[in-house]
């Protein structure tokens, strides 16, 4: 019996089969899955203390993404076999989830309350607070796992960069989860865009056909109605019983019918240089009233000034800029200018009739049905207004500019498609002879308001109307054009127009002329703040003086309680009327730069900064700028300058690139020169073509001598830029420091103190740009403070402190 028991104990155990082992594993996995699912369900529903605590423990790991995490884990527990069959599905979900953790944590640490906290400690503190209090209230981002991922990413790419990195993770995860790759997505997007474009085009064609059907139906109904009215009219006519004829003038009826059948001939408007048109301003009466309000008599702003809280004006207001009044000053008259000779452009009419036929035949040869409705003969170009037939695309006509120039044997053709405010297309063709528009002729026809001191007659439009603009509305003007295009003549015309209307105590000029020949004639007139600046190095300092004056004026306005120069001068007038102690009104200031490109080569940073500040703030202070350049490239007219000088005047340029730099569109490359311009004011979407006025050097000298005979120049020392030397620091082509940097000693002391030398250290410690830091390194090497560069090795410091 004992032996049998021993034999029974020593018998080997039966080995389980593979199927039995797999079954046991499946049972264990099922039990664990069910237990895990129950745990997750308790956590998701937050049932009792156990559920809240479990949920907070999961939040400690993945933060506020606990619900998506638990939901994904439940799917994995019961569908893991199916998920394993999908290539990349699990990896894609994990990578996308990590991206979401980074996004959630970046959002958490973008909150103001988390900006200065440590990433790990701040996250743990938020979660622990809820965990101990048995609650779920705080937003905890991506939990500790999110903090672990976010910290290095934020260190390398900042908080904003973390959003992009997280988005890339999510995008990569989506690509892994789906069978698509980047090429499939791009192909899908391209096909979708193509389908939308085709559908849009088909819908557009259907709408066009429907409109045409409605139009034809309306025409048919109109013809039927006209036929019925004609039958009714014939039925009511009186018939002579003897002759059987209708008692009506049949001859006139026949001639009327023939006139109806004959094609209407285009209207041709000849250019008359002495025709005085009432429409003499580029702006309507409302705009002129606004300009009058801003700069003229200041009547409309008196109510605004009186509505402000009255301030104590007994104390004298200190004004740095106090020009003298000129009580006996007389304004120049137009008689100073030589009368212009009448222009004979009679032969242009015959040429226009011929060109109308050529235009229609040329369009017909290209299969385009058009009709010339009107032709306006201007001083330099003739504008043909054509009406295309229904269904003709505008760009088909615009693309024929070169073909039209060939057919008309013209120098160039400019197409305005369409004309603003009209359902017509304008074709501008140069005249065989250009009629010069004199300054006197333009002044006599402009009817400019004498109270608007900065309203300037600019030129004549294609229809011969004199056009003017108010610099106070612009409020700054950019003038650009190649040599010989009429840019300097236009600037002289603007200056002369202001001198014709303003006394020295009303308007002051600061003129900058690096070429030294364009504006020097205005030296010693009483309107100048300082003599004409010809040194480019002084120009930047002079512009800075104007910036300082602008700031002083704003401080003065703030102290008085007014918003602009008009309100201040109104307050001064009211104070002077009621007090024996007189205050001096502030004059307007016009800054004129004749060649901006030369200034930008010498001191680009200082000049650009001053121009930008004046462009942004100077209008209310009564300061306006006119910037002229013959090289309209992007390195001269930067984007910031263009943004702050909204009004543009473009003369003939050499390329379409220059035209786009000035006007943001083509057109200036097709101008003829000699005063032919495109003017685009601040409140116009499209430029207006004008023929600028011509003012000779003799005319300028006469008006300058007339002014000099009445008053002497009274320069203001507050605007004097002082003397500058050739080695003056701070002036170089790129706006950095020139040779002999004033920070050399400070950089040397820094290197000797730290016994380290690198451009990045100097850039960081001295707050300078990289270019200036490298130049300081070169100067330190030349002075023997540091050794030469040795590849990637740090430089040796050769001196000690």
UniProtKB/Swiss-Prot annotation:
**Which SMART domains does this entry report, sorted A to Z?**
AAA, Ftsk_gamma
For region Disordered, the annotated ranges are 720-739
Entry domain remark: Consists of an N-terminal domain, which is sufficient for the localization to the septal ring and is required for cell division, followed by a linker domain, and a C-terminal domain, which forms the translocation motor involved in chromosome segregation. The C-terminal domain can be further subdivided into alpha, beta and gamma subdomains. The alpha and beta subdomains form the DNA pump, and the gamma subdomain is a regulatory subdomain.
Annotated FtsK domain residues: 464-660
For this UniProt record, the keywords arranged alphabetically read as follows: ATP-binding, Cell cycle, Cell division, Cell membrane, Chromosome partition, DNA-binding, Membrane, Nucleotide-binding, Transmembrane, Transmembrane helix
Recorded GO cellular component terms are: plasma membrane
Task: Kindly indicate whether the keyword Protein biosynthesis belongs to this entry.
Answer: no
- Coiled-coil regions in this chain? none
Alphabetized GO MF terms: ATP binding; ATP hydrolysis activity; DNA binding
In its keyword annotation, does this UniProt entry include rRNA-binding?
Answer: no
Give the source species.
Streptococcus pyogenes serotype M3 (strain ATCC BAA-595 / MGAS315)
UniProt GO BP? cell division; chromosome segregation
Protein's membrane topology: Multi-pass membrane protein
Protein origin, superkingdom: Bacteria
Per its record, how is this protein called by name? DNA translocase FtsK
